[in-house]
Amino acid sequence: MLSTGLYEDFPTLKMKINGKRIVYLDSAATTLKPKQVVKKLEEFYYNSYANVHRAVHTLAVRATTEFEETREEFAEFLGASPEEIIFTSGTTMAINLAVVSLLRSGILKEDDLVLVSLLEHHANFVPWLRLSKFHGYRIDFIRPSGRFGTLEMDDLLKHRDKNPKVVAITGLSNVTGQRIPVEELRNVFPNSIILLDGAQLIPHEPVKPKEIGVDFLAFSLHKMLGPTGVGVLYGKREVLEQMEPFLYGGEMIDRVSLEDVTFNELPYKFEAGTPNIADIVASREALRYLKETGFDSVHEKIEQLTQMALKEMMKIGGVEIYGPLDERQHGIVSFNVKGIHPHDVAHILDQEFGIAVRSGHHCAQPLMSILKEQSQIDFPNSTCRASFYIYNTEEDVKILVEGVKKVKEWFSR
């Protein structure tokens, strides 16, 4: 069971779905929010809200101070400098910012090679693919060769001699839960710009981009107890200084004349317009909550629940589970029940058992195609996905397993 304190921090856990207590297993999509985050949001709006970086009155100074202190806390968390922390609306915006700015600045040029893995969420796939049509750079794909979309080291090594300009890869698959060996990326691609999609990885462990040698790291706060509409892009200072801004407008400029524009210093030249001030400030409470809980404890708990779910789900006949099915699989269990569409499975789990899981292609259609190739069932180009976080328990896993068994029984009558 949850500790009383943790249970009280997440009021959503007290909900009932058709008389059943909610079992929230959709944290890979978005996490529940603790009371501390919501309280901070309310307090800031009532006591400190004003626009930032624009005025000298008391509220503006107070808001700007909290805003920049939040940036400093995220910089410390990532082992970076505040100038390397850019606030965005989420991982999708962060990645698009990096892609477009690399192109505008001429760092990524025609005939350069971009490597993208086939594990990617569309946010780290579509921008690279689509913009290659307009800018003439070449694109190649890192194809996973292991069990149901598992990326092996050899899959990376076979591309090392291609000298890619950019390597874009996730740190943890949002479909299979495979944790990629991000610590090895710089060794494999010593001269490449590496962009790491950390949307699923950072909520589970505090990766330090400088230590592992990546140039960009993108993630979203709503997947780690924070508000929606807040993302972080870490960018290596030496690269950011060369890059043209993604958006133009207020506060990202130094001087504007009739002839040209000069830009503000880092990180502000990448933060045009009024930012999502209150949600960014409240996101600091989410980070603090996780730090106080302890990321080692967060990681260990999620790992235990994942391995328990894998072990028990593998005992159910007619259930196909995707991913490596070993210690590399973390936080996510994607599966299908033979002969039953995942949308039907998810709907029944919700209505009959109070279980919230995701069903669909999870914004990863290229990976779905790979799963279909290896599937032993009539693969529906989608899966059910159960994902775990700090507020889940072993009892939640047991309810999920029993729910899947019941769904299978009902459809076999």
Curated annotation (Swiss-Prot):
Gene3D superfamilies: Aspartate Aminotransferase, domain 1, Type I PLP-dependent aspartate aminotransferase-like (Major domain)
Record key words, sorted: Pyridoxal phosphate, Transferase
N6-(pyridoxal phosphate)lysine modifications at: 223
Cofactor(s) annotated in UniProt: pyridoxal 5'-phosphate
Any one Gene Ontology BP term: cysteine metabolic process
Catalysed conversion reaction: (sulfur carrier)-H + L-cysteine = (sulfur carrier)-SH + L-alanine
GO terms assigned for molecular function: cysteine desulfurase activity; pyridoxal phosphate binding
UniProt-listed Enzyme Commission number(s): 2.8.1.7
Keyword check for Transferase: yes
Enzyme class: transferase
Keyword Transferase assigned: yes
Active site (catalytic residues): 363
Name this polypeptide is given: Probable cysteine desulfurase
Biological source species: Thermotoga maritima (strain ATCC 43589 / DSM 3109 / JCM 10099 / NBRC 100826 / MSB8)
